[in-house]
Amino acid sequence: MPELPEVEVTRRGIEPYVSGRKVERVDVRTPALRWPIPADLAKTLRGHVVRKVERRGKYLLFEIDAGWFIVHLGMTGTLRVLRHVPHPPAAAKHDHIDWIFDEFILRYRDPRRFGAVLWHPREAGDVLEHPLLASLGVEPFSPAFSGALMHRLTRGRKVSVKQALLAGEIVVGVGNIYASESLFRAGIRPTTAAGRVSLVRYELLADAVRVTLAAAIEKGGSTLRDFVGSNGESGYFQLDYFVYDRAGLPCRVCGTPIKQIVQGQRSTYFCPTCQR
């Protein structure tokens, strides 16, 4: 599943091609993804200029004067920029939506169809008030995110520190891959109860989250199966993983075999020596 780095890489890749450009047409080939695609989406967007593309957590927010269309990539979704002059590229089986601009097509592809394309009209209020966005935690690169915040919001909680990271109620966008990697950098065992992690260690974790996500964005995200950026190229942060998907391999720091366990039906990877 694309996590925050992959979504941010996508945003940075598509924004220069769509911001300030008019949507000439929208071709919707699939009536529903995770939820139904608004029936009048094509009519609503046609002729409007995209003001900017922002990200909130794992959601992409495309602003036009009438409101915002919201895109979530789900498990296998990608957005690619394709040149349609002189000849538009043919759509393949899993290419569900095209936003057509003067020279380019923004194409949404999603083999498993767990993604979403939604509409939030301006009269409904700010897009951040949308039900899917209103309860999200803070952005990891914002000044509001800190070890003190995590420490305060986890007091008395028995859930594991990894599951607290994944929940998205404290900080957004830290999925399974980057939770494992961040906990390794911070030296915290993922099974530790969130309420038992000290303020000092949470400060280390906050720094580790920022460093890990920034490094992943710099390297185009992670491509384990489906993800490609807006130009069709794979990310390569997976080459730098310390623990994720490295079960049985030696720790890059101490040489101890990396251990794999299951938490909340998801695989967790950690070093038994470096993480305590």
Swiss-Prot record:
InterPro entries: DNA_glyclase/AP_lyase_DNA-bd (IPR015886), DNA_glyclase_Znf_dom_DNA_BS (IPR015887), Formamido-pyr_DNA_Glyclase (IPR020629), FPG_cat (IPR012319), MutM-like_N-ter (IPR035937), Ribosomal_uS13-like_H2TH (IPR010979), Znf_DNA_glyclase/AP_lyase (IPR000214), Znf_FPG/IleRS (IPR010663). CDD domains: EcFpg-like_N. One of its GO terms (molecular function) is 8-oxo-7,8-dihydroguanine DNA N-glycosylase activity. GO terms for biological process: base-excision repair. Its cofactor is Zn(2+). DNA binds at residues 94, 112, 157. A zinc finger (FPG-type) spans 242-276. The keyword Hydrolase applies. It catalyses: Hydrolysis of DNA containing ring-opened 7-methylguanine residues, releasing 2,6-diamino-4-hydroxy-5-(N-methyl)formamidopyrimidine; 2'-deoxyribonucleotide-(2'-deoxyribose 5'-phosphate)-2'-deoxyribonucleotide-DNA = a 3'-end 2'-deoxyribonucleotide-(2,3-dehydro-2,3-deoxyribose 5'-phosphate)-DNA + a 5'-end 5'-phospho-2'-deoxyribonucleoside-DNA + H(+). Keywords: DNA damage, DNA repair, DNA-binding, Glycosidase, Hydrolase, Lyase, Metal-binding, Multifunctional enzyme, Zinc, Zinc-finger. SUPFAM superfamilies: Glucocorticoid receptor-like (DNA-binding domain), N-terminal domain of MutM-like DNA repair proteins, S13-like H2TH domain. It comes from the Bacteria. Involved in base excision repair of DNA damaged by oxidation or by mutagenic agents. Acts as a DNA glycosylase that recognizes and removes damaged bases. Has a preference for oxidized purines, such as 7,8-dihydro-8-oxoguanine (8-oxoG). Has AP (apurinic/apyrimidinic) lyase activity and introduces nicks in the DNA strand. Cleaves the DNA backbone by beta-delta elimination to generate a single-strand break at the site of the removed base with both 3'- and 5'-phosphates. Belongs to the FPG family. This is Formamidopyrimidine-DNA glycosylase.
